[in-house]
């Protein structure tokens, strides 16, 4: 490191001797202007050819993000509208299903009532027919028994008394 410092010091002394012997650090020398000119050229090149494409890409990205955000808002609105439409349609369908179910219950009750009335009528008719048959059979049995009572009573009296009782002769 000592060699490097001595080399720098030697070059500074040579530069001072060439410049006339006096160097003031407040007064700029020619290298400052050369460095300033190179810096301004590099700055101009960067400003002209590097910054515009980067700015363009950033602007495109920002526009794409804004479009995506707008699309997201629009999609959210469409989803909300579709959800509201779905809920409305579902409520209407439930109401319609309820009314159909109520109508079916009423129709079912009417059918049951009609069938019950028909069955009750058939039962009443069957009971009436059976009652009439039983009445006829009872009347027939009664008249048959009444016609045979005289003969049976005479036979029974003959057996009990041991005498032949003829009901025709006593009349």
UniProtKB/Swiss-Prot annotation:
A single GO cellular-component term on record: proton-transporting ATP synthase complex
What SUPFAM superfamilies does this protein map onto? F1F0 ATP synthase subunit B, membrane domain (SSF81573)
Localization recorded for this chain is: Cell membrane
Keywords in alphabetical order: ATP synthesis, Cell membrane, CF(0), Hydrogen ion transport, Ion transport, Membrane, Transmembrane, Transmembrane helix, Transport
Q: Name one GO molecular function term.
A: proton-transporting ATP synthase activity, rotational mechanism
| Task of the protein | F(1)F(0) ATP synthase produces ATP from ADP in the presence of a proton or sodium gradient. F-type ATPases consist of two structural domains, F(1) containing the extramembraneous catalytic core and F(0) containing the membrane proton channel, linked together by a central stalk and a peripheral stalk. During catalysis, ATP synthesis in the catalytic domain of F(1) is coupled via a rotary mechanism of the central stalk subunits to proton translocation.
Q: What is this protein called?
A: ATP synthase subunit b
User: What organism is this sequence from?
Assistant: Mycolicibacterium gilvum (strain PYR-GCK)
Q: State which gene encodes it.
A: atpF
């Amino acid at each position: 490191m000592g060699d490097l410092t001595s080399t720098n010091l030697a070059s500074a002394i040579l530069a001072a001797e060439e410049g006339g012997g006096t160097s003031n650090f407040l007064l700029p020398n020619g290298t400052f202007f050369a460095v300033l000119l190179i810096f301004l050229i590099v700055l101009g090149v960067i400003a002209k050819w590097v910054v515009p494409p980067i700015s363009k890409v950033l602007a495109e990205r920002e526009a794409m993000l804004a479009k995506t955000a707008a699309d997201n808002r629009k999609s959210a609105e469409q989803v909300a509208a579709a959800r509201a439409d779905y809920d409305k349609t579902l409520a209407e369908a439930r109401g319609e299903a309820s009314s159909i179910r109520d109508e079916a219950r009423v129709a079912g009750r009417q059918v049951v009532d009609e069938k019950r009335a028909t069955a009750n009528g058939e039962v009443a008719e069957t009971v009436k027919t059976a009652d009439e048959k039983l009445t006829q059979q009872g009347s027939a049995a009664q008249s048959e028994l009444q016609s045979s009572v005289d003969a049976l009573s005479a036979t029974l009296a003959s057996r009990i008394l041991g005498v032949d009782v003829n009901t025709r002769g006593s009349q």
